[in-house]
Each structure stands twice: as C-alpha cells, then as structure tokens.
A protein has these predicted regions:
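Peripheral (often C-terminal) accessory segments that flank ATP-dependent C-N-forming ligase machineries
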Residues: 247-356
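A conserved helix-loop-beta module that forms one wall/lid of the active-site cleft
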Residues: 39-108, 112
Length: 356
C-alpha cells in the first residue's frame, strides 16, 4: 500500500473491526483502486471501483445522459483540434469541487507541461456550456431509484472568494415550497436515475452536476457516485437522515440509536450553505474562534436549532489564501430569501476574519 493520501485512508480503515462497513465521500471516487482495496476486508456502503470508473468516464456518462433525454457537452480526450479561444475547458478527469478547471487558451496550450497530458489520459477538453449551475441528488437501490431533489449550485461566487470554477455552496428548496419550474426539472431528471441504477448498478446516494439553460435545456456535466456536500440541505428540509438513506439503499440495516434531541426538519423553508475561502493568508486565534462560536449560537437559534456554522478551523494556524475557512448555513422563506440571508452571514463572518 502506498504511503500518504489517499492510501493512508486505507490504513486508517484497517483499524476498524472488519464488520464495520466502509463508506466514503468526495473525492475518493477518483481512487477506485483504493475503494476496491478497502472493500476486500469489509462490506462496502457505496459504489465499488468498477461503478466509479464507468460513471467517471465522460464517454459512458454521455451515453447515459443521452439515453435519459438530457444533453451532454462536447467532450474530447485529446487537445488535438480543440479551439484555443476559451470556448473549451481543460478539466482533470480526477477532479473535485471545480479544482483545476481552466479555459483552454493559446497561452495554456503553449505551456510545456501539457506534453504530459498527451502522454496519458488525465484530462478532458469540454465545451464551455451556459446555464445555471445545478445538481440532482439520487438515492439508488436495486429497482428503486429515487430523485431526492434538485439544488442550485454556487460556483465561483466572488462573495465567497471562490475561484471561477470552484464549488462554494448550494441552495435547496423543499417540495413544499418548490414551484412549477422545479417540478418540471424533476420530471426531466427522473429517467436518469433509472439509467444509473439499471445500467451502472449504482447504489446509495449519487450526485449529478448539471447546467440548466433559460429555455429549460438540461445538460449533464459530471457524476459524483457518492454522497455530496449539497445533500445535507435536503435533511434540513425534511428528507430524513441522509446517512440513513444511504446505508439502507446500500443494503445495511440501520442501527438502533438512543433518543436524542435534534432539530426538527423545516419543510416550509429553503436552505442555503456556502464555503467561505480565505481572500488572503488568515491567522486563526482563539478569540476569533470564541467570537465565531458566539455568533453561531445566535444564528442557530434563529434557524430552529440547526447548526449555522461548520468546519470551524482550529486555533494557532494560518489558513492559506484561496483555502476554505468555514462553512455557513442559512434558512429562508424562499430560495432568494435563503440566499440573501446566507450572503449577509458570509459578509459578517468575512469581516470577522478580516477578509472583507
């Protein structure tokens, strides 16, 4: 076993009893060999390596999208003949969160490091497509594909200090407040869930990145064959335990849990989350942590007990520029209201960090 990430996770998994299922999230879909290695010693609560390889293959994903009646952007696996005017994106095949995506331009094509790209299949060239960044969340089990919902994805938002193509959050409306546009989009996306379950034998939670054009055209961009960072918002909106759904769909009986106080779902609310990135090297001191926790307690009470901040950094460190600092949540009466409340909170936290 190789040392370092991601193979160090295999060593960590080996420390658990063999009966404990292995479960993973992003971006281990890019390491199917590791997933297979872990599954040799324990049951797997998720998709095996062969499913990951197929769903991460743009050729196979294009076929699935087309058969489900959805569009897929022109995608090439070699730079030969690709226009160098920015109309195509250079995308790592083993990417996550939008990292490493760049417009394919003359200057980038002239970079001598791209000789390495031609020697191996590590990148794809995908036509830049216009549309609202969105995602579909599926819960798949044999014969029972289910669309949990659709989310608006936040990508490259300047108020999060995110790079142009970096994922930085999501907005979700529960079915109780979703309008006709959401219902039409859901109807368009249901056939894809059937293809994912039947053709690929995918199980558990699966996310699909989409672009939705103003005329309603839905373009599939990428598959994430594991629980995604947007899905916890569905739990806040009344979809039940996301982890529980995933385990059950993968064939595992849910363990009995002791009663505990937890926030009530808010089916009448829309929920939003954002990842705030560091605009510059950001020192983290204990007084800052204390102030964040104090503010979080206020917002958490406003949001019915649901945590308003997550991934709070440890003290005595410096967060590098462009690295994630903290995750922020907000609820609202509509998507627009939730998003505005989220932006207000991000601005407040940003000022606390000294990034404003």
């Amino acid at each position: 076993v190789e040392a370092g990430y991601p193979w160090s996770l295999g060593k960590a998994a080996a420390g658990f009893p063999p009966a404990v299922p292995g479960c993973y999230t992003g971006a281990l879909e890019n390491h199917p060999d590791l997933v297979d290695w872990i599954s040799k010693t324990r049951p797997l609560a998720g998709n095996a390596g062969d499913v990951l390889r197929r769903l991460r293959d743009p050729v196979e994903l294009e076929s699935a999208a087309t058969d489900a009646g959805l569009a897929f952007p022109e995608t090439l696996l070699s730079p030969r003949g690709v226009p160098e005017d920015g109309s195509f994106l250079l995308k790592p095949l083993a990417g996550a969160g939008g990292r490493g995506i760049r417009p394919w331009t003359q200057s980038l094509a002239a970079d001598p490091t791209h000789g390495l790209l031609r020697a191996g299949r590590t990148h794809a060239w995908q036509r830049l497509t216009v549309g609202l960044p969105s995602s579909a969340a599926y819960c798949l089990s044999p014969g029972k594909p289910q669309l949990l919902g659709c989310a608006r994805q936040l990508v490259g938002e300047a108020w999060c200090h995110a790079d142009r193509f970096a994922w930085c959050g999501a907005v979700v409306s529960s079915p109780a407040v979703s309008g006709p546009a959401h219902e039409r989009l859901a109807a368009r996306l249901e056939p894809l869930g059937e293809v994912l379950a039947e053709r690929f034998r995918a199980v558990g939670l699966v996310g699909i990145d989409l672009l939705v054009a103003a005329d309603g055209l839905v373009t599939v961009v990428e598959a994430n064959p594991r629980p995604t960072a947007s899905m916890e918002l569905y739990e806040r909106s009344g979809a039940g335990s996301i982890a529980g759904r995933h385990l059950a769909a993968c064939g595992f009986a849910l363990p009995a849990v002791s009663p505990r106080v937890q926030p009530s779902p808010q089916p009448e609310a829309s929920w939003a989350k954002a990842v705030l990135f560091a605009a510059r090297p950001t020192p983290i001191a204990q007084p800052l942590i204390d102030a964040l926790l104090e503010q979080a307690a206020i917002w958490t009470e406003v949001d019915g007990g649901w945590p308003s901040l997550a991934d709070i950094p440890r003290p005595a460190q410096v967060i590098p520029s462009a690295a994630p600092v903290v995750t922020i949540f907000a609820a609202g009466r509509s998507e627009a209201d939730a998003l505005q409340r989220l932006r207000d909170r991000v601005t407040h936290v940003d000022a606390m960090l000294g990034n404003a």
